[in-house]
């Protein structure tokens, strides 16, 4: 089925060419399985990452609405906030970020290095809060305050994860299908599942482009019971935007994010070290390290549907390594 309705949505061009899809020979030998990686960690802006795909659509909508300020939220070490700030700088917009400290640490490295350091370079107006308990409401309240100061704010949800932003990962599914055509018959795709937009967009795109390929989301912050409704809701919202059906089952693995969001674990850090030492590729302790731990364990536990090639979606996040230095 065609995804031609994607072209109806205004989109800014931040990425340019498709990101590389690479074979990992040494990692594949180590695991005894063909492993490929989609390098969304090397998107052009602000040290790379997946959120730029979403921001191509979201920032276009902000400009269409005449906004002069991007307002968003996340953790102190949020990759999404960093990339939103870079987009704002590139477009000459103001950026206001509502940040929380999800792990409750007072470690200076976490509070000032990594992504947080980059926010200062991008001249972001940072507002701290105790917790993002109801981020949509908190962002609306912040936008109201910003508007009262004479700005024209555009609210971007946590992770850029709404139906419009998730279109960026329908676009990514198109790239993946084109890059694999005639070259590799993917059995499975593995992605970190957090704010759910990346996962949902891929789910819609892959269902229509590579229907025999299973998509597995490795949760980084929630149990399956809590995460699945979020992914399904976005999956259906994206499908409605594109006037498509979305019947693919959402598969999630939740055994790899403990002790909680933003706190590294041993398996995740081992995955970070393994890929660095075998392939010279940097994962991160919060998202991709834990997702890769799921991939590694999934192979050893025979959780994948067959023995075919696996594609890992590298969503970026390496700047956080510097903030988590004692764990690395």
UniProtKB/Swiss-Prot annotation:
Top class in the EC scheme: lyase
Catalytic activity: D-cysteine + H2O = hydrogen sulfide + pyruvate + NH4(+) + H(+)
SUPFAM superfamilies, per the entry: Tryptophan synthase beta subunit-like PLP-dependent enzymes (SSF53686)
MF terms in GO: D-cysteine desulfhydrase activity
InterPro entries registered for this protein in UniProt: ACCD_DCysDesulf, D-Cys_desShydrase, D_Cys_desulphydr_bac, TrpB-like_PALP, TrpB-like_PALP_sf
Identification of the protein by name: D-cysteine desulfhydrase
CDD domains: ACCD
EC number per UniProt: 4.4.1.15
Functional note: Catalyzes the alpha,beta-elimination reaction of D-cysteine and of several D-cysteine derivatives. It could be a defense mechanism against D-cysteine.
Annotated positions of the N6-(pyridoxal phosphate)lysine modification: 51
Superkingdom assignment: Bacteria
BP term (GO), one: D-amino acid metabolic process
Pfam families xref list: PALP
Keyword tags: Lyase, Pyridoxal phosphate
Family per record: Belongs to the ACC deaminase/D-cysteine desulfhydrase family.
Organism, scientific name: Escherichia fergusonii (strain ATCC 35469 / DSM 13698 / CCUG 18766 / IAM 14443 / JCM 21226 / LMG 7866 / NBRC 102419 / NCTC 12128 / CDC 0568-73)
Subunit-structure text: Homodimer.
């Amino acid at each position: 089925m065609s995804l031609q309705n994607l072209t109806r949505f205004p989109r800014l061009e931040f990425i340019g060419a498709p990101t590389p899809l690479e074979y990992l020979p040494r990692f594949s030998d180590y695991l005894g399985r063909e492993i490929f990686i989609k390098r969304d960690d090397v998107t052009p802006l602000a040290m790379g990452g997946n959120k730029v795909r979403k921001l191509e659509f979201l920032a276009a909508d902000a400009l269409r609405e005449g906004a002069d300020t991007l307002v968003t939220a996340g953790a102190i070490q949020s990759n999404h906030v960093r990339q939103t700030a870079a987009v704002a700088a590139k477009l000459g917009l103001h950026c206001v970020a509502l940040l929380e400290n999800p792990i409750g640490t007072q470690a200076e490295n976490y509070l000032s290095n990594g992504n947080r350091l980059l926010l200062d370079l991008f001249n972001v107006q940072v507002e701290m809060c105790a917790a993002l308990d109801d981020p949509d409401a908190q962002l609306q309240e912040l936008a109201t305050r910003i508007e009262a100061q004479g700005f024209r704010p555009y609210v971007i949800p946590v992770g850029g994860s709404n139906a419009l932003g998730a279109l960026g990962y329908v676009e990514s599914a198109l790239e993946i299908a084109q890059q694999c055509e005639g070259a590799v018959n993917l059995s499975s795709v593995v992605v970190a599942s957090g704010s759910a937009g990346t996962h949902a967009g891929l789910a819609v795109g892959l269902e229509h482009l590579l229907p025999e390929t299973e998509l597995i989301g490795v949760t980084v912050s929630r149990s399956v019971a809590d995460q699945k409704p979020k992914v399904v809701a976005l999956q259906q919202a994206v499908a409605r935007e594109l006037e498509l059906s979305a019947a693919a089952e959402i598969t999630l693995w939740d055994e790899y994010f403990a002790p909680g969001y933003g706190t590294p674990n041993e398996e995740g850090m081992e995955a970070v070290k393994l890929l660095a030492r075998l392939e010279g590729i940097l994962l991160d302790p919060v998202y991709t390290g834990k997702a890769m731990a799921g991939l590694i364990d999934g192979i050893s536990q025979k959780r994948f549907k067959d023995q075919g090639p696996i594609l890992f979606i590298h969503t970026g996040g390496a700047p956080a390594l510097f903030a988590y230095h004692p764990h690395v």
